[in-house]
Regions:
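Short, Gly/Pro- and small/polar-rich lid/capping loops
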Residues: 1-43
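Active-site- and interface-proximal helix/loop "cap" or "latch" segments in soluble metabolic
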Residues: 13, 21, 35-197
Length: 197
């Protein structure tokens, strides 16, 4: 259902963030973000001269290369448009994200490496969203891995706990989604086992 009709208004500022997930030929995954900020009016800038209506105030990129375990193999950032020339000096710091794993504690670890004066607020803000896109991109790859695991199970290998179990309301151990998708991992399965003991 869409939002209700707004009151009469005029657009002043637009932040556009595009997030994309790519599966590479080498099996790794690139998560890429492009952020732009524009105004609907022109204004003078001490460092850039006149910034026209629709001209980017910020035009920034981040690319993270990750493996199937959500480990960041490489990260790079670039700033095409910034309010100050010195802003581009923050982009090399984002290479320090290599070696982090996207998961619990990711945002804290990001802030330790590129927080405050070590990085750029705008580039840092998109990293949490990039983590979400990484999970959305990786899901089909994990599905294929789980399908292979199910084949191995049929041969007698034990099944691993699903990575998404317990990560949100839909994947709560007592949810209908878990009961259908992973019945052996639902709370009902645990209760059945306890009743048999």
């Amino acid at each position: 259902m869409p939002l209700s009709a707004p009151a009469p208004r005029k657009l002043e500022h637009l932040r556009d963030i595009q997030l994309r997930g790519y599966v590479r030929e080498d099996g790794l995954v690139d998560i890429e973000a492009h952020l732009t900020d524009t105004k609907t009016y022109g204004f003078p800038s001490e460092h850039r001269g006149q910034v026209g209506p629709g001209d980017p105030i910020h035009g920034m990129w981040v690319r993270m290369t990750i493996n199937e375990d959500m480990l960041i193999i490489a990260c790079e950032a670039a700033s095409d448009h910034t309010p100050f020339a010195v802003c581009t000096g923050a982009t090399p710091a984002f290479a320090k994200l290599a070696g982090l794993t996207i998961g619990p504690g990711f945002n804290r670890a990001v802030n330790e490496r590129v927080g405050g004066v070590l990085g750029c607020t705008h580039l840092r803000e998109v990293l949490a969203q990039m983590g979400t896109v990484a999970f959305q991109t990786m899901w089909p790859l994990r599905n294929r891995r789980q399908a292979a695991q199910r084949k191995a199970e049929a041969a007698g290998a034990p099944r691993k706990r699903p990575a998404l179990l317990g990560t949100c309301h839909a994947y709560a151990p007592d949810s209908p989604v878990v009961r259908k998708k992973w019945p052996e991992w639902s709370d009902l399965a645990e209760k059945r086992e306890e009743a048999q003991i």
